[in-house]
C-alpha cells in the first residue's frame, strides 16, 4: 500500500494548443492556488508540448509556484498514449496529492486514462473543490 504521506502539492495539467495556453489553465491554476494555500503546499503546472518553455512563465501570474515543462517534438500535438505516459511518469516520480485536469476534450480523454494507470479515483466535471484534513467536498453541476 502506498504511503500517502509522501504525496505533496497541487498540480495542474496545463493544456496548450499550437503553443498557446488555454483559458482553462488560468482558471485551474487560480483554483489550485486556493487549495494549495489550504493544504500548505505548492502549486505546480505541468506543461507538455514542443517549444513551450516560453509560455510557461505566464502561469506564475495566476498562482503557480513552478512549472514543469516536458518539451519534445513528440509532444507537439496531443496524443493520448504519449501524454498519458508522460503525465503518469511525472506523477509517479514527484507524487502530487492533487492533480487537476480541465474538462476539455483533451482533459476528458486524458483524465480517465491517467486515473486508471495510476490506480486512483477521478472526479469529473467538479465546479468547486474543498479539501480538509478529514474530508473532501465536491460541487458538481446538476
Per-region residue spans from a language model:
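Short, glycine-rich nucleotide/cofactor-binding loops
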Residues: 12-27
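Histidine-anchored nucleotide/phosphate-binding helix
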Residues: 25-36
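Short internal beta-strands
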Residues: 44-49
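A glycine-rich helix N-cap at a beta->alpha junction
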Residues: 58-79
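Proline-aspartate-enriched helix->loop->beta-strand connector
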Residues: 95-96
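Short Gly/Thr/Asp-enriched flexible loops that form oxyanion-binding sites at enzyme active sites
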Residues: 106-118
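Conserved small/polar residues in nucleotide/adenosyl-binding loops
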Residues: 136-142
Amino acid at each position: 500500500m502506498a504511503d500517502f504521506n509522501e504525496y505533496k502539492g497541487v498540480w495542474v495539467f496545463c493544456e496548450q494548443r499550437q503553443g498557446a495556453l488555454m483559458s482553462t489553465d488560468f482558471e485551474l491554476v487560480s483554483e489550485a492556488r486556493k487549495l494549495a494555500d489550504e493544504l500548505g503546499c505548492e502549486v505546480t503546472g505541468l506543461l507538455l508540448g514542443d517549444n513551450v518553455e516560453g509560455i510557461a512563465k505566464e502561469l506564475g501570474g495566476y498562482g503557480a509556484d513552478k512549472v514543469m515543462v516536458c518539451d519534445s517534438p513528440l509532444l507537439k500535438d496531443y496524443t493520448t498514449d504519449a501524454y498519458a505516459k508522460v503525465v503518469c511518469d511525472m506523477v509517479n516520480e514527484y507524487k502530487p496529492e492533487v492533480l487537476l485536469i480541465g474538462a476539455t476534450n483533451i482533459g476528458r480523454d486524458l483524465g480517465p486514462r491517467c486515473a486508471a494507470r495510476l490506480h486512483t479515483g477521478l472526479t469529473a466535471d467538479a465546479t468547486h473543490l474543498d479539501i480538509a484534513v478529514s474530508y473532501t467536498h465536491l460541487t458538481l453541476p446538476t
